[in-house]
């Protein structure tokens, strides 16, 4: 089972309320604005600020 792409249309970053992009390779939802990656565990996004991973500029998707 994979992350439902319809879900990406309605979920938002819990901090800035901006769009999240799915990084399938790392199984994370990425917020470019806040430079954070939220884990996706068992196809469920974990959108908790304390579980977010800070991203370096070079890790951000294009």
Curated annotation (Swiss-Prot):
Pfam assignment, any one: Trm112p
Gene Ontology CC, one term: cytosol
Superkingdom, natural source: Bacteria
Family: Belongs to the UPF0434 family.
Annotated HAMAP family: UPF0434
Name this protein carries in UniProt: UPF0434 protein Tola_2233
Native organism: Tolumonas auensis (strain DSM 9187 / NBRC 110442 / TA 4)
């Amino acid at each position: 089972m994979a992350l439902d792409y319809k879900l990406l249309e309605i979920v938002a970053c819990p901090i800035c309320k901006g769009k999240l992009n799915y990084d399938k390779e790392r199984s994370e939802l990425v917020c470019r604005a806040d430079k954070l990656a939220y884990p996706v565990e068992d196809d469920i996004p974990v959108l908790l600020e304390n579980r977010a991973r800070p991203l370096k500029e070079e890790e951000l998707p294009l």
